[in-house]
Swiss-Prot record:
The chain crosses the membrane at residues 4-24, 34-54. It is a multi-pass membrane protein. GO terms for cellular component: plasma membrane. Keywords: Cell membrane, Membrane, Transmembrane, Transmembrane helix. It comes from Bacillus subtilis (strain 168). The keyword Secreted does not apply. InterPro entries: DUF2929. It comes from the Bacteria. Pfam families: DUF2929. It is found in: Cell membrane. The lineage of its organism: Bacteria, Bacillati, Bacillota, Bacilli, Bacillales. This is Uncharacterized membrane protein YjzD.
Length: 61
């Protein structure tokens, strides 16, 4: 379930960012390019989440 929610948030936030950047640069918004960027970001986030060590003991801050 966390993978689905992470994909939805990554998809929405990357599309929002691409739309804002496109409008600030006075270029047209491209849904296909934004979707590719969203998928790449999702894969990077999931890989980093698996690589990073988890802190098993929360009392050691």
């Amino acid at each position: 379930m966390r993978y689905i929610i992470a994909f939805i948030w990554t998809f929405l936030l990357s599309h929002m960012a691409c739309y804002l950047v496109a409008s600030m640069n006075s270029v047209t918004y491209n849904f296909k390019t934004s979707s590719v960027i969203a998928v790449v970001l999702y894969v990077l986030i999931m890989v980093l989440a698996e690589i990073m060590p988890m802190n098993k003991n929360a009392s050691q801050h």
